[in-house]
Amino acid sequence: MASEELSLDELFERLERMPVPEGYKVEIVEGNIFMSPQRDIHWNIIRRLVRALEDRFGMDVNVLSDVRMDFPDKNGFAPDVAKLADDAEKDARGRWRYQDIEWIAEVISKGTAVSDYGPKKDAYAKAAIPIYLVVDPYVGRCHLYTEPKEGEYHSHLTVDFGTEIDLTAAGLELTLKTDEFPRD
């Protein structure tokens, strides 16, 4: 008997009817459901990233956090931080388009590390997200992926917390300070 493959919308509709524990984030990665707990250190870094974007681009910067966005290959993510183009508009279904994303940052947790470094990185490269930043509070490092081509990132920079990350060459007029990122 053939199984019926559900669309992302159908999967998310089913998730909305399920009792998801409070404080958990739910995403669909390559058609599989992942739940991960939100932690205070995780949120503290996200807040610092959003503030850095607001400080540089103003309070009206088009930035989202934990908002569902659909990506190629049955991936429905809620990036920790996503900066969209100033002229980005929602599609006919009322959703933001991944084609308008200029920058994504994911702060890993123990439960999301494999996904953030693997399938999510691959999906973001396939979607040609220009800048993908992985912040790892467990080892105190940031991984910057840029130059997406043919489904892969062709540039990778690793820096320790405390090192500034200049995103200008990657197309975003921002130098990100990491010296106050907390470690877990």
Task: Name every feature range the model reports, one short phrase each.
Residues 1-127, 131-184:
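Gly/Pro/Ser/Thr-rich low-complexity, intrinsically disordered segments predominantly at protein N-termini
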